[in-house]
Amino acid sequence: VSRHPYVLSLLSQAYQGLKDWDKLLDLLPQLQKHKLLTVEEFEQLQRQVHRNRIVQGNTEPQHLLAIWHKVPKYLQRDAAMIEAYVHNLIKLGDHDAAEDALLRALKQQWSATLVRQYGYVHSVNATRQLARAESWLIAHPEDPQLLLCLGRLSLHEKLWGKARDYFESCYRLQRSPEICAELGRLLTALGEP
């Protein structure tokens, strides 16, 4: 690759247009070395490259893990990056890795977005998973995403009454289409109007 700044800039634009995130990843050090972007622009591009590589890395869990290991440590703590990674792990059926990643992240910093993802994880020990999520209610009693998560985990365990209570509590706090759909499906399944 040419080291000429103008060529590097053109390559960066071309790779972005082509959505060739792997080639753009290889180009990042040169873009940084030649200071072709501000610090903010570089970090934004770096975030975009790694997020898109994660989103597209949905072939098998090992491949996704290799992609994740190339993500800089500071971005591995970013909620949006973790969410993309966990979403793909769940899609690939690696619920154990998804749960581990979420628990590590939530231990560092609370994130309603990540708690929402926790409701999609099918843990090997679903009872323990539900109990863990319920323990979070002490610190976050009115977090709609936590209540939605708890409703979903309760549904998975076929705890209909508990699921209904969580969904209704969530509905009182936030009347999103998502919670309306969850509550509606549950009430229909229970044969209630």
Short names for language-model regions:
Residues 1-193:
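Repeat-based scaffolding regions
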